[in-house]
């Protein structure tokens, strides 16, 4: 690799959300720049004015920052090579294109779209590469000027040299393209709008980019870009084309596989350090060993572009969620409690909307249901209790059903509970347990609940799962879940709070269960 100070860039188009593939490209550029002590540049490629939107640009910036990816130069922080937004330098692209025409390295093409379609169709019929046949290559410059002056629209095409185009790729090695399969590319449309393959070269050269790290879907664009660098008299940067990311079915990763955008993973409750850790391992591996857990600072230290593989990477959702579970467990309790509040709020909003018969309820209608220290503290404790069993934070409401969704009739009808409820000793256990709970007048503590269970054990002679499973079903609706010594006090505390969706106390639950069972 070059000895020049590294200048790497991520250049997204603000035409949609940031997806896994582009996020990996951004991450690898960032890791490489930071590992090499170089400069990270963010450039917005928004020449597609019809599809580019400010909201997408802001979302891109937000997602990158959420991932921990920062930049030294960009549209929001400035830098020595402005502007960092392509739409602000259209005139620059036109000037360079006209210079190429003046030097005979490019020419005006007057072929209509119908002509181009006909060329392509015939080439395919003849089993030839469907490249532009060079119809306007020989048009005399004076004739081209006359036609343009008369109002005829013309695009500008680069003259591809009549020789193979070669370049070295850090991932793929030495690459060669025959000029017989590379068309003279349009660099400036007849409308005056420059095309991607052209503007990216101008920008990379003017911003002194030393390494172009991007997806291998751009590999076929590279010979045209190399030819442009040479025609413009600029140094060709080093290239590293990252492998394709495939879904579990070995097809190109897409929405049909599930979440693919960073915004969606964020909403699902995937932590940034988990996503960064996982994406970094898509097509790259550290030197030696089988280690899988890497903090961002460790990734920076370990990252080496030469260890990026050209083989496709498989996106394993379960592996990502396994990593996320690891990072959730390692995260500070207060941080997870703060993040979890979003999911509890959304759950409560949905429940209230369902209760009042509305398909959707704005958060303002919840009247700040948890705007109290007592509710905050209780939710933090609930989160701490159930979060070890989740892979993503959006699973919290499902685990929280033990507090908010107690339904005795549903518990009795649940086939998973059938074997326990039909056991010979269950009736005696539930009768003794129900009687004792009914006689309690104060909220149950962990110690008092344990004492009651021991009394039932002594009275009935039943122990182990034959004792605990029926009691758990009566209290929670299911025969598995958190330990009673932590669960029962939280149920009782929740029942004492003024929540819009009430938490039933243990006494209320057991009475409801007994009534439904009789």
From Swiss-Prot:
- The biased composition feature labelled Basic and acidic residues covers 140-150
Name the UniProt key words of this record, in alphabetical order. Aminoacyl-tRNA synthetase, ATP-binding, Cytoplasm, Ligase, Nucleotide-binding, Protein biosynthesis
Q: Which reaction does it catalyse?
A: tRNA(Glu) + L-glutamate + ATP = L-glutamyl-tRNA(Glu) + AMP + diphosphate
User: Gene3D superfamilies from the entry?
Assistant: 1.10.10.350, HUPs
Sequence motif 'KMSKS' region, location on chain: 252-256
- The superkingdom listed in its UniProt entry is Bacteria
Q: Which Pfam families match?
A: Anticodon_2 (PF19269), tRNA-synt_1c (PF00749)
Q: Indicate where this protein resides in the cell.
A: Cytoplasm
Region named Disordered: 130-150
- Disulfides per UniProt: none
Q: Name one GO molecular function term.
A: tRNA binding
Describe the family membership recorded for this protein in Swiss-Prot or TrEMBL: Belongs to the class-I aminoacyl-tRNA synthetase family. Glutamate--tRNA ligase type 1 subfamily.
What does the UniProt record say this protein does?
Catalyzes the attachment of glutamate to tRNA(Glu) in a two-step reaction: glutamate is first activated by ATP to form Glu-AMP and then transferred to the acceptor end of tRNA(Glu).
Protein name, UniProt field = Glutamate--tRNA ligase 1
According to its UniProt entry, this protein's organism is: Koribacter versatilis (strain Ellin345)
